[in-house]
UniProtKB/Swiss-Prot annotation:
One of its GO terms (biological process) is biotin biosynthetic process. Residues 37-264 form the Radical SAM core domain. CDD domains: Radical_SAM (cd01335). The gene is bioB. Its cofactor is [4Fe-4S] cluster; [2Fe-2S] cluster. SUPFAM superfamilies: Radical SAM enzymes (SSF102114). This is Biotin synthase. Its EC number is 2.8.1.6. It comes from Coxiella burnetii (strain RSA 493 / Nine Mile phase I). Keywords: 2Fe-2S, 4Fe-4S, Biotin biosynthesis, Iron, Iron-sulfur, Metal-binding, S-adenosyl-L-methionine, Transferase.
Length: 321
């Protein structure tokens, strides 16, 4: 389906396909471009937590809401390296660092640049998510050796206005442009289950599809309703709708890595297995996802074994029991 001129109507038709027919098409596409036994493992660390000035309705790190998140200033290089070493020992391929900023403060960015250089020296791929970037900041990250920059669109432009008011959709597009122009791989996806419609989910995929280049990796998050945020009582997305969205993401983006991201802690092994068959071929690996719970490494390893996928070897020192 590469090169297809997708629009709302044509993507909507995919959603109307019988479930197994849609998954069959997605799995065929996946097999054509990837080793179906391979699962890309990434670890995500919160290097600066809380007091974010943005008002993203889903986020417990926003300074606008009273949540249980403990505020923490930018952690030091030694702490980052210790986490990265543990991640590598346990089979992670990429180490991602997230900071709750609107954009990286001038006084803090040099510290992050040093983190990138040091983590890469361990033999890991690097990814950061630091908020909005101007062109100069993106070039500095590239010079430090950054491999990926994560900046999600979150949802459709229409629904976005109900979720965030402190940063525009165009602000996000501008950051993605600066990242691309700097020669950094783009990691960009969204969040499902915030109360959006199917049309919103379709439009999110079309916004990603219409970027000058497809994102190298596409994280698909399921909302984790956090107490104290405006979305704490939001009804969960239907599991079949979630799986279908992943399958359609695979059809629109045959060569992108699709990461099953936030929300896995609440997913059954069976639901995750369906997501993998639909085309998801990456997970965040480790018992924490920024400030949210994530399945323990043993649970993930056991699931990968059950499914006959490639399994990392846990060291006895770092295994999670």
């Amino acid at each position: 389906m590469k090169g297809r001129n997708w629009n709302q109507a044509s993507v909507a038709k995919l959603f109307e396909l019988p479930f197994f027919e849609l998954l069959y098409k997605a799995y065929e596409t996946h097999r054509s471009h990837f080793d179906v036994r391979d699962m890309e493992l990434c670890t995500l660390s919160s290097i600066k937590t809380g007091t974010c000035p943005e008002d993203c309705a889903y986020c417990p790190q926003s300074g606008h809401y009273k949540t249980d998140v403990e505020r923490e200033k930018l952690i030091n290089l030694e702490a980052v390296l210790e986490q990265a070493k543990v991640a590598k020992e346990n089979g992670a391929r990429r180490f991602c660092m997230g900071a709750a900023w609107r954009s990286p403060p001038k006084r803090e960015l040099p510290k992050v640049l040093e983190m990138i250089k040091s983590v890469k020296a361990l033999g890991l791929e690097t990814c950061v998510t630091l908020g909005m970037l101007d062109q100069e900041q993106a070039l500095q990250l590239k010079e430090a050796g950054l491999d990926f920059y994560n900046h999600n669109l979150d949802t459709s432009p229409e629904f976005y206005k109900k979720i965030i008011t402190t940063r525009t959709y165009q602000d996000r597009m501008e950051t993605l442009k600066n990242v691309r122009n700097a020669g950094i791989n783009v990691c960009c996806g969204g969040i499902l289950g915030m109360g959006e419609s199917r049309a919103d989910r379709i439009q999110l995929l079309l916004e990603l599809y219409q970027l000058p280049e497809p994102p190298t990796s596409i994280p698909i998050n399921q909302l984790i309703p956090i107490k104290g945020t405006p979305l704490e009582n939001t009804k969960a997305i239907d599991p079949f709708e979630f799986i279908k969205t992943i399958a359609i993401t695979r059809l629109l983006f045959p060569t992108s890595v699709i990461r099953l991201s936030a929300g896995r802690e609440a997913m059954s092994d069976e639901l995750q297995a369906w997501c993998f068959m639909a085309g998801a071929n990456s997970i965040f690996y480790g018992d924490k996802l920024l400030t949210a719970k994530n399945p323990g490494q043993n649970r993930d390893v056991n699931l990968l074994k059950k499914l006959g996928l490639k399994v990392p070897v846990l060291t006895e020192e770092y295994a999670c029991y």
